[in-house]
Amino acid sequence: MWRLPGLLGRALPRTLGPSLWRVTPKSTSPDGPQTTSSTLLVPVPNLDRSGPHGPGTSGGPRSHGWKDAFQWMSSRVSPNTLWDAISWGTLAVLALQLARQIHFQASLPAGPQRVEHCSWHSPLDRFFSSPLWHPCSSLRQHILPSPDGPAPRHTGLREPRLGQEEASAQPRNFSHNSLRGARPQDPSEEGPGDFGFLHASSSIESEAKPAQPQPTGEKEQDKSKTLSLEEAVTSIQQLFQLSVSIAFNFLGTENMKSGDHTAAFSYFQKAAARGYSKAQYNAGLCHEHGRGTPRDISKAVLYYQLAASQGHSLAQYRYARCLLRDPASSWNPERQRAVSLLKQAADSGLREAQAFLGVLFTKEPYLDEQRAVKYLWLAANNGDSQSRYHLGICYEKGLGVQRNLGEALRCYQQSAALGNEAAQERLRALFSMGAAAPGPSDLTVTGLKSFSSPSLCSLNTLLAGTSRLPHASSTGNLGLLCRSGHLGASLEASSRAIPPHPYPLERSVVRLGFG
């Protein structure tokens, strides 16, 4: 019992103060070893074995010697007792964990099948046999069965070896979910890869079904994969070329707006050389009007033809006009080709082509009154005020439609409201003659005095207002068709017919360069 206080004092020398144990520091005895005042002593019970003889009676020198020796050893307690407690506590925790692992291993059922499936190869086997493996990978061809072939039974022997090679290049602790989240971002996946993915998953589900090998099918599959890769590379190259062409065309339009025609034409030419139809059309405009390059109609026709062959509606319209304007194209096949291109552009919704065909079909040898009304009506509904005015003439004279004077007046009013000067002049003439609400006979007389024939050649003064319309730069000066004897006027006359504007061509290029 007399050793217990010493053990407690040795284990808890710092946490227990003298006030708790009601012990004061031991002072220095004259004949004993000296102790420091900071050393704490635990209470020592009265271990005097003298019994009831009283304090003055001693149990002998041997008994007092053991007590003094123990007190002297207790006063020399080492200050490293906290480190000892931590060390022993750590060892105790490790021992508990070891016992827990031993208990868990002992609870598992024993057997060769369980040991094989619990090996570290099992997660890699499931990974390499899953459809998440890249469909175009060379490893997958040796691991997964082909879509048409059997599921080889030796894949389980080869997969761990391939899995070890792959594990050296990837972190070993990545999860199945992280792989699934990263796979859709693979840029090399295309449509054939998805098709192979479906076949791979179905072959895994039917892995237990035996089948005969088909070497020919595997070769065809490899060939199709090779072709798919080549198609993917070609598509990427075409996309890159298109992006560069769009950038060049955009720079050309920006330079055209800023007035740098030379730089604009240079950018248009670079984009046109890459096969971009919109840049080819813009380059044709520059050649036709001499902006940034000397004026050359033959080169303009060439660029229009290149863009028209790709389905560019504005290029089809301008190329058809050039064919009709060329004296060498007076023979029938070239005219039919020009009319066919104009129809394609008009059917695509191009207002300029619709207006041009509406007037073209009122003149020989293309005279077709019903088709003329059709295209004039389409152009008028697309906002062309001049076509609305021409449609009013057709209703007033019964050209291609049943004669309707009220509809003719409404067409004149709608065209005049859009700023058409010819329609405004026609309305003023009707009002000055007292024809604001005329009878049928009065309006017939007025119409006969004003118009001798609704044909194109008789509309010289009526079509003169076309030169003052905003779309005259694209449709041409239709009022000069009768005086020139053939469709279209010279480029000089067309340029003079365009209303004065700081950059008429630049506005046309910017508006139509991306259309």
Swiss-Prot record:
Region (Disordered) residue spans: 19-65, 144-226
Domain of life: Eukaryota
Gene3D superfamilies: Tetratricopeptide repeat domain
Residues annotated as site: Cleavage: H142, I143
UniProt KW Amino-acid biosynthesis keyword: no
Transit peptide: 1-23
Domain writeup: The TPR repeats bind to and activate EIF2AK1/HRI.
UniProt family annotation: Belongs to the DELE1 family.
Protein name as it appears in the record: DAP3-binding cell death enhancer 1
Lineage: Eukaryota, Metazoa, Chordata, Craniata, Vertebrata
